[in-house]
Design a protein with these regions (language model features):
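Domain-scale macromolecular recognition modules
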Residues: 1-24
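Residue-level signature of catalytic and energy-coupling elements of molecular machines
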Residues: 5, 14, 33, 121, ...
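Short glycine/threonine-rich beta-strand-turn micro-motifs
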Residues: 1-2, 26-42
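Charge-rich, low-aromatic oligomerization/scaffolding segments with amphipathic character
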Residues: 40-55
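Glycine-rich phosphate/pyrophosphate-binding loops
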Residues: 19-30, 135-137
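Divalent metal-dependent catalytic cores for phosphoryl transfer on phosphate-bearing substrates
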Residues: 105, 116-120, 125-179
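Structural secondary-structure packing elements that flank or coincide with functional cores
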Residues: 62-74
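Pre-Walker A segment
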Residues: 80-133
Length: 179
């Protein structure tokens, strides 16, 4: 009842603020948040939980909770990017690139978290590079960043590979890592 609001105004305000569709089911206590964008979905989830916990669900409070959730999700992404760089042994990336990398934390592919897949790839690439005498640092960085284009592939034209190359070039990543 409170989530929907009078004549659906709360649901409409929430959908407008988050860009996520709200599906209210007959099952009590359940709301489905639907979006192809995993970051929007996470912002909506965090905001909805805060609204339900607070109990005061109204358009002004919705805006406030969504803005707080945006900041929280952004901060979580940045922290996850920093952790991934540490775990993968890839230091000294541009802070904005680390934040973009952290957005992969909210994405899955074939049921696996894309950020942790990238960390695993970086560590495997390092082992293989060591075995064959290749540059371990380049292999680590290339593997960690190989899916970076997936963070914005739904917002920008091109394949995630093409987008990733443009992102890495923008932040001055060396050509050996990009190729």
């Amino acid at each position: 009842g409170k989530v929907i609001g009078k004549e659906g105004r709360n649901v409409r305000a929430f959908e407008r603020a988050t860009g996520v569709d709200v599906l209210v089911d007959e099952t009590p206590g359940y709301v489905v948040l639907s979006s192809f964008d995993p970051i929007r979905r996470e912002i909506a989830r965090v905001a909805m939980e805060a609204l339900v916990k607070d109990g005061r669900i109204q358009p002004a409070k919705i805006e406030e909770c969504v803005e707080t959730a945006r900041k929280e999700v952004s901060q979580t992404g940045r922290k996850m990017g920093e952790k991934a760089c540490y775990d993968a042994g890839v230091p000294n990336l541009h802070p904005d690139l680390v934040a973009i990398l952290g957005r992969l934390h909210f994405r899955t592919s074939y049921g696996q978290n894309v950020l942790w897949h990238s960390v695993e790839m970086a560590n495997m690439a390092a082992i293989i590079a060591e075995e064959v005498g290749a540059d371990v640092a380049v292999a680590r960085a290339g593997a960690l960043l190989h899916d970076i284009g997936k963070t914005v592939s739904h917002e920008v034209a091109g394949t995630h590979v093409e987008i990733g190359i443009r992102i890495l070039q923008k932040y001055g990543v060396e050509e050996a890592v990009i190729l």
